Curated annotation (Swiss-Prot):
The lineage of its organism: Eukaryota, Fungi, Dikarya, Ascomycota, Saccharomycotina. Its EC number is 1.1.1.8. GO terms for cellular component: cytosol; nucleus. This is Glycerol-3-phosphate dehydrogenase [NAD(+)]. GO terms for biological process: carbohydrate metabolic process; glycerol-3-phosphate catabolic process; glycerol-3-phosphate metabolic process.
Length: 424
């Protein structure tokens, strides 16, 4: 006979119940969620109509066509790779659907390239398709490709960063002086900024250099599947800036949910920016290792072992260096274990790791050969994590991360991986 009391009190049951409760809350209480945030969001004083009050009224109405913001939020996406273009598509669909909240036009900054003698921006704007990075997907007509990052960002209330993270410093320098003081940002970037003073989230890097609040978006999201409208989930993390003054202060959780949520792209908004960011960055390192064992033909058992050790090290890294992060984020959110599973099953990084094992070529060579101008973010994150762990004397506490570094950058044979994880 099953001991019902013991079952209900077990940690596994409690964790599953909490997840189910969150899912039910998201499915059946979206309207009350928006109303609650609209009521409890902090207010600010500004000349003329109070933008926050207008936003609250719109979000609390079941049909909001009769109310319109005096100045709707302008949204810009910085980046146009396959994930950048996919997020821009999602956002542009929502600015069309909610003209009371958002300006219809969405600018997408595009690094200008020549495609068969034509500018990529011209192709996108005329054919409504990113033929290089997201071919075969029709883009909304209100999504406008812009070759100038400064012009694209001008007057934007919300900036969505979605570029390879190794280019962030250069882009931020170009944006300085062109971002309005009241703007808000969401980072879809995966990686860290490492310096002599420590390891830093990329959202924090954006905040410090552009002086605007920045959240993060991450989840179990393979870009081609989202772009096709296949159902998936994601997590947006954003902390309301209590001590910030600006006209963008009414960009809160409810507004962000309206901006990113689609019938095929379900969004949960939380405040754990650190947890979401760490999970999104480190899963790419784990995916490289997963690719190694799959490429060696060791099968699913070995891949599962890599993911177990990887998840443990991801959580340990977050707790050690970003104590404000929440452990439950890694288990309950799409940006945690769900993203790890998806990335290890079919992302760019597992593809590169597998190809390294099968061909003997370097990660850098394969990135150029296989990814059509895209980046394998795990290659760069692996180096950043190693630099930081070496700097603070913690390398031995993260054997998987160090093993991936040694394989990618020092030529250690992949066959040594089990030995390097003996005590993990």
């Amino acid at each position: 006979m099953v001991n019902t009391t013991a079952l209900i009190r077990s940690p596994t049951f409690v964790a599953q119940f909490r997840v189910l409760k969150q899912v039910n809350r998201g499915l059946f209480s979206q309207t009350s969620y928006a109303r609650t945030h609209a009521r409890t969001s902090y207010t600010h004083t500004m000349a003329g109509t109070d933008r926050l009050q207008q936003t609250s009224q719109i979000l609390s109405r079941s049909t909001s066509s009769e109310i319109r913001l005096e100045r709707p939020f302008k949204v810009t996406v910085i980046g146009s790779g396959n994930w950048g273009t996919t997020i821009a598509k999602v956002v542009a669909e929502n600015t069309q659907e909610y003209p009371q909240l958002f300006e219809r036009r969405v600018d997408m900054w595009v690094f200008e390239e020549q495609i068969e003698g034509r500018k990529l921006t011209e192709i996108i704007n005329e054919q409504h398709e990113n033929v290089k990075y997201l071919p075969g997907i029709t883009l909304p007509e209100n999504l406008v490709a812009n070759p100038s990052v400064a012009a694209a960002a001008a007057d934007a209330d919300v900036l969505v960063f979605n570029i390879p993270h190794q280019f962030l410093g250069r882009i931020v320098e170009q944006l300085k002086g062109h971002v309005k003081p009241g703007a808000r940002a969401i980072s879809c970037l995966k990686g860290f900024s490492v310096g002599k003073d420590g390891v830093q989230l990329l959202s924090t890097y954006i905040e410090e250099h552009l002086h605007i609040p920045c959240g993060a978006l991450s989840g179990a999201n393979l870009a081609p599947e989202v772009a096709k409208g296949n159902w998936s989930e994601t997590t947006v993390a954003y902390t309301l800036p209590q001590d910030f003054r600006g006209t963008g202060k009414d960009v809160d959780h409810a507004v962000l949910k309206k901006l990113f949520h689609r019938p095929y792209f379900h969004v949960n908004v939380v405040d754990d920016v650190a947890g979401i960011s760490v999970a999104g960055a480190l899963k790419n390192v784990v995916a490289l290792a997963c690719g190694f064992v799959l490429g060696l033909g060791w099968g699913n058992n070995a891949a599962a072992a890599v993911q177990r050790v990887g998840l443990s090290e991801m959580i340990k890294f977050a707790r050690m260096f970003f104590p404000e992060s929440k452990v439950e984020t890694f288990y309950q959110e799409s940006a945690g274990v769900a993203d790890l599973i998806t990335t290890c099953a079919g992302g760019r990084n597992v593809r590169i790791g597998r190809a390294m094992a099968e061909t003997g070529k370097s990660a850098q060579e394969l990135e150029k050969e296989l990814l059509n101008g895209q980046s394998s973010q795990g290659i760069y994150t692996t180096q950043e994590v190693h630099e930081w762990l070496q700097q603070c004397g913690k390398k031995d506490e993260f054997p998987l991360f160090e093993a991936v570094y040694k394989i990618v950058y020092e030529g250690v044979p992949m066959s040594k991986l089990p030995d390097m994880l003996e005590d993990a």
